[in-house]
Amino acid sequence: MLAKVERIDPSELELNDKLIFINRVTKVVKGGKRMGFAALVVTGDGKNHVGIGVGKAKEVPSAISKASANAKRNLSRILLNGTTVPHEIVFKYGAAQVLLKPAAPGTGIIAGGSVRAVLESTGIKDILTKSMGCSNKANVAKATLGGLTAMRDPKTTVTKRRSSLKEEAAGG
């Protein structure tokens, strides 16, 4: 679902964590109810690196620290065109669908909820977004990250297409 990317060392970056949400979960056992917590954290340096992590624990602080550590393990490098994205993309993760459109300088981040948190952590300043389908914060955040990692440089894509067309003509 999400694109594979090269491993990024988090110790070399100045990362900031943002807590997207905390979920209280209950497990019913013979003796009663067991409470636990799940946290979703996005971490980024504001300079094209971002990661999302989920942590689960009996206490809130340990769930947040586990989520932060998980986000640092899942860092991705994002391709940007100045302060916005290079092209429009619609990405789907589960039932969540996110539309990311480039915007003119000075537009700002037109997004809400977990989409905004991921985009701010990435360092994007101008973008238009639309979240469709389900409103599950984890799936929306993962769809946003998936869309950002699926971005390709238009110039590189054009040169690859031209070279493959030349190979087709020469070989066929």
Curated annotation (Swiss-Prot):
Recorded superkingdom: Bacteria
GO molecular function: rRNA binding; structural constituent of ribosome
Keyword Acetylation part of the UniProt annotation: no
One Pfam assignment: Ribosomal_S5
Domain called S5 DRBM: residue spans: 15-78
InterPro entries documented for this protein: Ribosomal_Su5_D2-typ_SF, Ribosomal_uS5, Ribosomal_uS5_bac-type, Ribosomal_uS5_C, Ribosomal_uS5_N, Ribsml_uS5_D2-typ_fold_subgr
Gene Ontology cellular component terms for the protein in this record: small ribosomal subunit
UniProt keyword Cytoplasm, yes or no: no
Keywords associated with the record: Ribonucleoprotein, Ribosomal protein, RNA-binding, rRNA-binding
GO terms for biological process, alphabetical: translation
Description of its domains: The N-terminal domain interacts with the head of the 30S subunit; the C-terminal domain interacts with the body and contacts protein S4. The interaction surface between S4 and S5 is involved in control of translational fidelity.
Subunit architecture: Part of the 30S ribosomal subunit. Contacts proteins S4 and S8.
Record-stated family: Belongs to the universal ribosomal protein uS5 family.
Chain's role: With S4 and S12 plays an important role in translational accuracy.
UniProt-recorded name of the protein: Small ribosomal subunit protein uS5
Biological source species: Dehalococcoides mccartyi (strain ATCC BAA-2266 / KCTC 15142 / 195) (Dehalococcoides ethenogenes (strain 195))
Primary gene name: rpsE
